[in-house]
From Swiss-Prot:
Subunit record text: Heteromultimer composed of HisG and HisZ subunits.
Main localization, broad class: cytoplasm
Organism phylogeny: Bacteria, Bacillati, Bacillota, Clostridia, Eubacteriales
Keywords noted in UniProt: Amino-acid biosynthesis, ATP-binding, Cytoplasm, Glycosyltransferase, Histidine biosynthesis, Nucleotide-binding, Transferase
CDD domains named among the record's database cross-references: PBP2_HisGs
Subcellular location: Cytoplasm
Pfam families, A to Z: HisG
Cystine connections: none
Name assigned to this protein: ATP phosphoribosyltransferase
Free-text comment on this protein's domains from its UniProt entry: Lacks the C-terminal regulatory region which is replaced by HisZ.
Organism domain of life: Bacteria
Gene Ontology molecular functions: ATP binding; ATP phosphoribosyltransferase activity
Record GO cellular component, one term: cytoplasm
Amino acid sequence: MKNVKIALTKGRLEKKAIEIFKTININTRELQDKGRKLIFNCENEEYNIELFLVKAKDVETYVEYGAADIGIVGKDTLMETNKEFYEVLDLNVGKCKFALAALPSFKLDQGYNRKKIATKYPNIAREYFRKKGMDVELIKIEGSVELGPIVGLADAIVDIVETGNTLRENGLVVVEDICEISARMIVNKASMKTKKDEIIKIIENVSEVIRQ
């Protein structure tokens, strides 16, 4: 049984993925009291798995370069970049959406003024406005993008919306939904050949859980 390395996004998706792994009998005992550890042995009679926790944007890199065979990461991260791997499963967890949001006075029509859009996801925002035939100025922000329209930095924002509470608390409204997103499983292309049996087993078992 070949060793399979899984890169898992820290935080919210981590907890949901571990629940799925438990259901298919992957050994997650070391993850219950992980402290500062980053690598975990999840081996048992059914699986030979090594799991490590990384930031969302790094999951793709680990998988693309073969340091991880499998990755669990949000679709938002995948949409923003263009890296080489297989996207094999929608895990149906971590559901939220991309949306255009602004102060209630904002009008989406182009008008004469070029709109300024604040976002952590410039590639996704660029593609969204390209499809609308709109020329906008994108302002990349790493922190709380909701602040952009409030202080006059931007006319609107493109961001992830889960409950909408943060928008409401800051006086913003959703102007338009862009797309639904959720957690995905990705696989290194070479690993799919060299560790095919082990990886297919994990994919099939996780698929069965998702369908239930």
